[in-house]
Amino acid sequence: MAYNLKQTLNKEERLSPGHRMCAGCGATIAVRNVLRGLHKEDEAVITCATGCLEVSSFMYPYTAWKDSFIHNAFENAGATCSGVEAAYRALKKKGKVKNTHKFITFGGDGGTYDIGFQSLSGAMERNHDMVYVCYDNGAYMNTGIQRSSATPMYADTTTTPVGSESDGKAQNRKDLTQVIAAHNIPYVAQTTFVQNFKDLHTKSEKAIYTEGAAFLNVMAPCPRGWRYNTPDILEICQLAVDTCFWPLFEVIDGKWIVNYVPKKKLPIEDFLRPQGRFKHLFKPGKEELIARIQAEVDRKWEELLSKAK
């Protein structure tokens, strides 16, 4: 069926309003739009790693989730979901479960790139019929904006503070999407909030209805941690893809597909400048730092294009 934005947006919300997420939070936007990939007749079981999303949307006895929701611990959301999915298959085989259920895990970059990576990797390698969705906001935002392995190089965080002896985080960010693609699972995709959400909506539905393991990495900007003007979130996302900092691509059964090639690739400073976490890079004498970021972005972009040939 051809994509229809109006029909997609008119689907019933599966995440209720009234939760405690910050105004303009990218994680909430990601969740609402991923869940729009579910067909109306299907139920979902959601597992969630500890993080902004979990502590703000589920505080017993209150929940913003209309589907079944499980929070276990920070590090084991992938294992929890794979266990529930395995139990469902066993019960379905015995005829004890009639309805169709889909299994979705949400985790931030801290619970996905770092603390929960081993349970994510295991679930993907075993090819459980589930979707792991990382809402990547580039740091441990819930506990005070500490750096994670998803934090970009030279970002100012509370554990990589900028000062006379530091220019922020010294390391490049981990390319987790490619790491998961190396697990040879049926579907891997990277996306964010662009194209009236068409890219996110279509990839979410593909991931949810792919047989076997699927992984979505969604760049979900955090106005508090990134220090940009809150209403500018969609502009920030568009700059991320137009500078090729956050390319849009899929890996379907091992085939690499680039979904968006900018007509005019913008310089990386266009993405960095609106964010307070990078303001130190625009002081005199810091030009070389921006050049290093640009060189890494260019290298990764060319590497991606070569994989998609």
Language model features with spans:
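Cofactor-binding active-site loop characterized by glycine-rich and histidine/acidic residues
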Residues: 2-132, 145-155
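Conserved thiamine diphosphate
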Residues: 8-11, 18, 99, 149-209
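Electropositive phosphate-/nucleotide-binding environments in soluble metabolic enzymes
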Residues: 12, 24-28, 74-78, 170, ...
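Short, well-ordered beta-to-alpha junction loops that form the rim of enzyme active sites
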Residues: 49-51, 218-221
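Short gly/pro/ser/thr-enriched loop/turn and capping motifs at secondary-structure boundaries
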Residues: 54, 137-142, 223-225
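Short, conserved beta-strand edge motifs with alternating hydrophobic and charged residues
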Residues: 134, 188-192, 215-219
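Active-site lining segments that contact anionic ligands and/or coordinate catalytic metals
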Residues: 211-215, 246
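Flexible, low-complexity linker and terminal segments
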Residues: 220-309
